[in-house]
Amino acid sequence: MTAKFLRSSAVLIAFALAVSVGAKVSTAQYGGGGRDIPAQPSQPAAEKGDKSEKGEKPAKVNKAEEAAYKALYTARTGTPESQIPLCEDFIAKFPQSHYLVGVYSQLTSAYFAADQIDKMFAAGTKAVELNPDNIDVLALLAMAMSRRVKPSMPDAKQQYEKAETYAHHAIELIPNMAKPDTIDDATFEKAKNDKLAMAHSGLGLIDLQVHDKPEDARTELTQAVQLASNPDPVDYYLLGNADVKASYFNDAVAAYEKCAATGPLVAACKSRQESAKKDATTKMGR
């Protein structure tokens, strides 16, 4: 899952900052978007000019803040290891900055890519507190929380409900996003679909493992693998499990085959594929 994110993080983080840093800001990988149309790209003040619409005097620029944000903005397509200290340092030095929502969004994605999941949840929660319509973070948390939370945890019910709320809200917001001028149509659609895929992935896992609704899980997980520009093998694994539980054994064989091609679950997928093949010949399937 993390490797998949790393392959696409450059485009997604660039997209996240483009639609997220402003009056209504967002980053979830894979924040962007708001209840209203998301703000246009927020670049360092030295690049965009900080003049008011009424011709008033420009707001006083904190040169240290602008320099720090410029370095962070430039690093948005780099490795998570290069972004994390810049984001953390910015937050510590400028806790009241108007750039803060975008910084927390970028930090959430960077923590996820670096597999620092607990820190990712903390940063993501802060990003959503600052902007409840942060599409990037909503989608990322919906997917990551559903995989991280275990039914045995004391607060599992509340965490699953929160993940579902994040997923549904992201799915509600994404179709109404406005394309930033800095991004072409194809890149914009790809980014939107990748976010939708993450939200549907989270819902599918919860339908399967929490609500015991394999048919609903199949619907959500099918959307996840169809929408994703680079489908997550974990989603194919979960889809195969949902297929088996709903007695779609031949579909399960196909899902496990795709899961077994790459990723962290190759051995498990191959084993389950063989089991599904036997079920297809010995059990009443659909």
Which residue ranges define each predicted feature?
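Structural motif corresponding to the intra-repeat A-B loop/turn of tetratricopeptide repeats
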Residues: 77, 114, 148, 157, ...
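Residue-level recognition of tetratricopeptide repeat
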Residues: 109, 143, 147-150, 205, ...
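Terminal, low-structured helical/coil segments at or just beyond the last alpha-helical repeat
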Residues: 32-34, 180-182, 193-205, 209, ...
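Short solvent-exposed coil/turn linkers within tandem alpha-helical repeat scaffolds
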Residues: 93-100, 130-135, 175-194, 226-231, ...
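TPR repeat positional signature
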Residues: 68-71, 104, 138, 145, ...
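N-terminal leader/linker segments that initiate helical-solenoid repeat arrays
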Residues: 22-102, 286
